[in-house]
Amino acid sequence: MKIFTQKVKKLIERKDFQVLTKLLSENPNLANKGITIPFDFFCRQKKHPLHRICDAIFARKISDDDGIIFAKIFLENGAKIDGNKINGGGTPILAAASLHAEKLGIFYIESGADIHYTYQDNGETALHWASFCGRDKLVDRLIRSGAEIDGQDKTYNSTPLGWAIHSLQSNDTVNKF
């Protein structure tokens, strides 16, 4: 099985959508099998493929648009939109929000991601992270989708607005900030 999970990572790195589609259709269990970060030779920690797509976008190795294509392939072949949530792990929407994968985060919401989930019950939601990272389009979509705007995290006892005010460091010209 390890050879297949390494192959999934390599197919993401090569942006080989067709071969990945074929591999996952023949081995659908791989759609939820953890992989290390694409393009990173030192990473040893495995996470859900929908999470790792966000890592590749953050590293600017793939575009948001390519990330959406990859996510569609994984989802069409049985990937769980909430990744390893059932095991207490982070979810792909949390990864997208915290790793500046704005378009992909919106796609995850449209695909049914749990926008209310907090990692390890610490109160930090996708809205907290999108606010901190200055992702106004993702913040807007989360709010329009019913995300709790007054929820406080347990570490800083702060709302998403508090996180946004704290960071105010986004130099991203695509965002309104």
Cite the ranges covered by each PLM segment:
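Ankyrin-repeat and related helical/solenoid repeat scaffolds used for protein-protein interactions
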Residues: 137-140, 144, 149-177
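Ankyrin repeat domain, specifically the short helix-to-loop turn at the C-terminus of the second helix
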Residues: 24-30, 70-80, 106-114, 140-148
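Ankyrin repeat A-helix N-terminal signature
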Residues: 10-15, 44, 52-65, 95-101, ...
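N-terminal segments that cap or nucleate solenoid repeat domains
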Residues: 1-49
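Eukaryote-skewed repeat-based solenoidal scaffolds used as protein-protein interaction platforms
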Residues: 87, 94-100, 118, 124, ...
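Ankyrin repeat boundary signal
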Residues: 32-34, 83-85, 115-119, 149-153
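Start-of-repeat signature of ankyrin repeats
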Residues: 46, 88-89, 122-123, 156-157
